[in-house]
């Protein structure tokens, strides 16, 4: 019985992939990935002055990482909103196929799993850019022993934003809801990038990645798992109650 349930969940997850990756979603993903690559290459400054680089190599490496992470997180907000919009638009058509013979909890978990796998591959791609672009561009650049932290912190940030967007999209099932959340998320990131006081405050409660010459940090690392669990449970609860009313 356990094996059959496991296969059923895998099947649902695969089916949701087909709903998630439709033409509009694929276009947004493709354009975003290409733009991220192009902008990260530009941030590496192909026209830098070599003598200046030799004197300020560490500062240039830190600046590259900081600016690249900022751009990556902005594009992640757009990608997450696209996924949330797909969730809102395709929810009824996908759910109606299985509600009569499949638990709502299993349907909901399959959606989360599908999105989590997508985000894993997205963040792997982004971390590869953060490592390979400077490795190719900068003669003195060495792969940091914190590289694994790039992925962990990026994934924590991305999954937190995704679950929050899912929660909002499920509680307020209108197209404009995830778009408003995207706007607020981008505004917070812009303010954090430009105002130190705001960043110091916000980074204590939401996943804002900090970069300096000492390395990369995530001040809210102890708080974020609580938010992820809480928002996941709220999302599951709202989804379950909402379906019961239909």
Each model region followed by its residue ranges:
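Hydrophobic alpha-helical transmembrane segments
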Residues: 14-21, 59-68, 90-103, 167-181
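Helix-loop-helix units of permease transmembrane domains in multi-pass membrane transporters
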Residues: 83-116
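Aromatic- and glycine-rich beta-strand/loop motifs that create alpha-glucan
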Residues: 1-31, 170
